[in-house]
Every structure is written in C-alpha cells, then in structure tokens.
C-alpha cells in the first residue's frame, strides 16, 4: 500500500469516527528517546524514517514536522506522498500545536493514540482547543487498523542486575522512593518511563532500539508494587528476585483498566513529563494528583561506588576498541587504502572492535559517522544515499557509543585522515581548548550547567564562534544514554539541576563549518567531591573516557601552558590504562600518539 493510499485510508477512518485532525507522533507508550519497530507508526504512515517527527492529517491536508537534522532526508522521502514538509523552527512555520489550534473547526475533534502522547502535551492541547469548544478523542489507534503486518511487541528476554553490578538492592531503592512519596503526601506512585523502572527494580530488557530497557509500567504502593509487563520475558530467577520485594506481575496493558479503580482518598504521584495522556485520562476524577518529577530521576543520576567502578571498566573496553579503530584508520591513510572505506564500513568496523572486547550488548545510540562536510551536520546519520568514501587530507567525525555488561559509553573523536589544512587544525585546537577548560574546572557544590558552560565555550566565543547544541548531558547506567536531570548548557531552562558527586555527564564542545568539516570532541566525565572547607564543598570533573586526542590535528602554538599540562596529563593516563589492552604494534603507535607536547 503506497503512502497516498495509507493517508486516504486514515481519512476514511477519521470520517467514520468523527475526527477532524489526527496526529501521529514518534513515540512509544513510555516517551522513550528511541522506539521499537512496533511503535514506528509515523514511519509507516509517512515513509519518513528519521528518528524525530510528527505527522498531522486533516480532511484535506497532511504535514510532517521535523527538525533541521532531517530536512534533506525528509524532502527525498516525502516526495510524491502528498505530505508537506514543515521545517520546525524556521521562520513562519507554526508548531504542531499552533497548526492544530488554528485549523481545528468549531466544535471539532482532535484524535490521537493517548498512549504515545505525554500528559503534558495532551493537557496543553486540551487547553488550547477549549477556545473552539473542540475535544480530544484519545483512545483511537487508527494506524493499527491500517498497518496489517505491524510488528509484534518485543518478546526478548529480560535480565536482572545483581548487586555486584547495580550496587544497591531493589529493596533499598524502594525504601528511598516510598520515603519521598510519604513526604509528598502520596500513597501511590505511577512510573511509566522505562529507565526509571529499570533502575528501581534492577531489571533490564532488549525492547527498545539501542537502550537495554524493558517495556513495562510500575505502580508503587505502600506495601507492594504492581509491575505491568509480558511475564514470558522473565526467568524463574527474576520472578523470585521480584517476589522478595512484593512485586506483583500483571499483564502489560492491564494498567489502563486497573488505574480506573483508584479511590477518591488516594493521592497519586505522577511525573507530567513522563506520564502518557491515556493513563492520566483514565485516573478517576476526585483522585488527587501530585505532579512532580519522579524521585528516581535524581536518584539514578547519582551513581553509587559499584556503578562507578563498573562504568570505568566499560570505558576501558570502549577505550581499547576506539584506540584500535583510530590506529586502523591511520594505517589505512599510511598505506593509501583509506579511500576503500566509507562512513558505513568504518562504523561497522568500529562496532566489530567493540564486540571483540567481551561483554558487548549493543550500540548505545545510532552512530554518527560524518566524513568531511557530513561531519558539519550535528546529528548526521549515514545512509546508503548519503554514505561518503573516506578520502585523504580530511576530517572524520565519529560520535558513537556502546552498552557493555558493566555500563554505557558515549564518545566522539574527530580524526585527521592525513595532512589537514591550517584552518582545520585551528578549529580542532579551539574545540580541544574548550574541552580542556571544562575538564580542569573546580567549582563549588550548588553550581549547575549554565555556570560551567560559560567556561567551556569561552575559547570559541572569543573568536565570535559557537556551537548550537549542549556541551554535555547526563549518561545513564545501562539506561538512557541521554539522562537528566543535570546537563551542561548556557540555557537555564535546559540544565538547572546542580551537579552532585557521582553524576556522569559528557563534555562535548564542537565547531561546524557547513560544506567543509565538523569537529566534536567528547569524553564522559564523573563529578567528584574534592576539598571541603570553610567555603563549602568543592567538586571537579574526572574524565573517564580513555582515547587519545589527535596530535596531528592540533596547532600546538595555540595551546596555553595550562592546555599542554592538561593534555599531557590526560594522554599519560590513556597510555597507562589502554596500552596493556593492545597489540605490540598498536602499543608502539599509542606511545607516539600520546607523546608530550
């Protein structure tokens, strides 16, 4: 069935159900960053395969909203579909909410599957529609009626994290959550975000692309926990571990009926940013809601000593794999064979190096491997259509990561494939200076992202340059690779949570020259407590990624003495930690690649 036919069939169903506008976002029932095959309804209906976008269909119009990462791809994939590309954030382009508000008729009906729309978004739409006496019909998955060969929900087996990996029992975590529930005056807490359930109960799965998470909902009561999940994914051992904490296993979709039984005296703690609109709408009127962030969001962001130890071990494996990869690239340049490789083949080779390390589970996100001008596209995703051959005297940006049994990694390196231009060297060096400034920063407890971001961006700002993305984000422990609540960005709205010892974040400044090259240099960093004195508790960042920077891409004359000290200190650590994991030839290369400057 062609895309035009699918849209026509959708309009037939809309007319049958009295729906004027139907919205299809990119989401699963848990607002996950990546979604499994079953949830790719927007891809099925539009033909657009990018990871972000929303399809809105009226009786005579269809539009696909996506951001700048995907404009070119969307243009190609939407051609001939009858769907207009709506370029988000471009002047004159309304948001989906603004479009719906303007185009819904008086007394009209907006339809969507309320399980894939957040409580917050659904509530906003509901408020906006009141001006036209319009309503929402949220219990309608019209795409499901069209998608005849829709993939089933994942049936992959779950696994359990023992305390030697998790560092804390589920019993202890539940005690902490119930304490916060009590302080909030709540006797029930609904958790729909997969990483929060995974952390709380020490369970993981393979139900979401790139993230080792389990499709599930959790409802925490004062004396037991209801876990809504496909029970066939659990071994007897997992069931026994859950039973110790009075976890009652129920069918995955039963939550939508069960919450209708909440009583008027119940007080329910919900996170509006994570709860889906269908669950919110099924909670009976009269039940009091306490709207605040899930307690687990901050709890899981502060890693315990066991998690930190395991994360560092994962980074040693990742560091060995990525160092082998850079050595492989440099040898291909030396032999004149680099042009035989492409972005996609190099990405596959890097993944193979990771697989060889042992304990590899899967990539932690869709790899970004951009050669030359493709490196200037911040969230570039190589495809058969865009795949470039690697050529000499250019830069190759690789932003990749892995989930190992001990933890998750996220690293970016930009590699010089031979002799590069003075401009490229200058740009690489400035970005490295941004990175080093943040790495060596010492600051007081209570400081948050906007404060430290000013230091990171300064070397570029002095030259009136910048990058249009955050300098850093939190990283989950076998959870989401982009984890809140802390981040590093000058925008207060995006990173207000103060840093706390035990948090793991990224340090990833960049510079992007359209049509020429892109540079991003990323390590993961651990927030560590240092001196405590009459002025307060001081913190610092410890790099926990162990891969050399590219000395062939650095203009040493631009480095300050502090830069050189920090660079040499880091390179000594990289050599000491990674050299034992390499072959004799690789070790000799690494010795030279980490020489003092």
Residues of each region from the PLM?
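Active-site neighborhoods and metal-handling regions in enzymes and metal-associated proteins
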Residues: 1-597
């Amino acid at each position: 069935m062609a895309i035009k036919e699918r849209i026509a069939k959708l309009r037939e169903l809309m007319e049958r159900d009295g729906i004027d506008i139907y919205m299809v976002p990119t989401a699963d029932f848990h607002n996950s960053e990546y979604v499994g095959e079953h949830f790719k309804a927007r891809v099925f209906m539009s033909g657009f395969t990018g990871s972000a976008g929303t399809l809105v269909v009226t009786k005579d119009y269809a539009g696909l909203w996506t951001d700048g990462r995907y404009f070119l791809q969307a243009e190609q994939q939407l051609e001939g579909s009858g769907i207009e590309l709506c370029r988000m954030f471009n002047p004159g382009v309304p948001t989906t909410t603004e479009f719906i508000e303007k185009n819904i008729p008086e007394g009209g009906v907006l339809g969507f599957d309320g399980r894939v729309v957040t409580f917050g978004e659904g509530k906003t739409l509901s408020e906006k529609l009141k001006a036209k006496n319009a309503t929402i019909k949220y219990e309608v998955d019209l795409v499901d009626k069209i998608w005849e060969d829709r993939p089933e929900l994942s049936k992959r087996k779950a696994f359990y994290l023992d305390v030697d990996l998790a560092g804390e029992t589920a019993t202890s975590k539940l005690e902490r959550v119930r304490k916060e529930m009590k302080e909030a005056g709540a006797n029930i807490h609904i958790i729909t975000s997969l990483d929060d359930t995974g952390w709380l109960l020490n369970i993981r799965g393979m139900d979401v692309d790139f993230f080792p998470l389990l499709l599930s909902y959790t409802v925490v009561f004062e004396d037991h926990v209801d876990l809504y999940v496909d029970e066939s994914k659990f071994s007897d051992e997992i069931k026994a571990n859950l039973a110790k904490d009075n976890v009652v296993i129920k069918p995955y979709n039963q939550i939508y009926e069960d919450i209708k039984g909440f009583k008027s005296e119940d007080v329910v703690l919900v996170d509006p940013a994570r709860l889906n609109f269908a669950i919110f709408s099924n909670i009976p009127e009269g039940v009091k809601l306490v709207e605040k962030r899930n307690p687990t969001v901050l709890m899981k962001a502060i890693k315990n000593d066991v998690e930190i130890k395991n994360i560092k071990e994962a980074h040693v494996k990742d560091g060995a794999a990525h160092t082998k990869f850079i050595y492989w690239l440099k040898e291909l340049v030396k032999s004149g064979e680099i042009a035989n490789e492409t972005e996609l083949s190099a990405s596959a080779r890097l993944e193979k190096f990771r697989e060889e390390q042992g304990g590899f589970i899967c990539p932690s996100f869709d790899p970004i491997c951009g050669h030359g001008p493709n490196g200037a596209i911040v969230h570039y995703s190589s495809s058969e259509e865009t795949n470039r051959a690697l050529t000499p005297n250019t830069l190759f940006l690789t932003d990749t990561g892995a989930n190992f049994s001990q933890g998750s990694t996220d690293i970016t390196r930009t590699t010089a494939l031979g002799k590069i231009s003075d401009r490229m060297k200058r740009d690489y060096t400035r970005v490295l200076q941004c990175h080093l400034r943040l790495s060596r920063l010492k600051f007081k407890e209570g400081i948050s992202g906007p404060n430290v971001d000013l230091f990171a961006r300064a070397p570029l700002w002095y030259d009136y340059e910048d990058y249009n993305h955050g300098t850093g984000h939190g990283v989950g422990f076998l959870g989401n690779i982009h984890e809140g609540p802390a981040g590093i960005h000058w925008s207060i709205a995006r990173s207000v949570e103060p840093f706390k010892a035990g948090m793991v974040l990224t340090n990833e400044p960049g510079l992007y020259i359209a049509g020429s090259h892109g540079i991003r240099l990323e390590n993961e960093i651990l927030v560590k407590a240092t001196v405590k004195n009459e002025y307060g508790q001081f913190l610092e960042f410890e790099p926990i990624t162990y891969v050399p920077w590219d000395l062939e891409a650095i203009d040493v004359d631009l480095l300050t003495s502090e830069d050189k000290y920090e660079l040499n200190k880091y390179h000594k650590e990289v050599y000491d930690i990674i050299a034992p994991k390499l072959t004799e030839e690789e070790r000799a290369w690494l010795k030279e690649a980490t020489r003092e400057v």
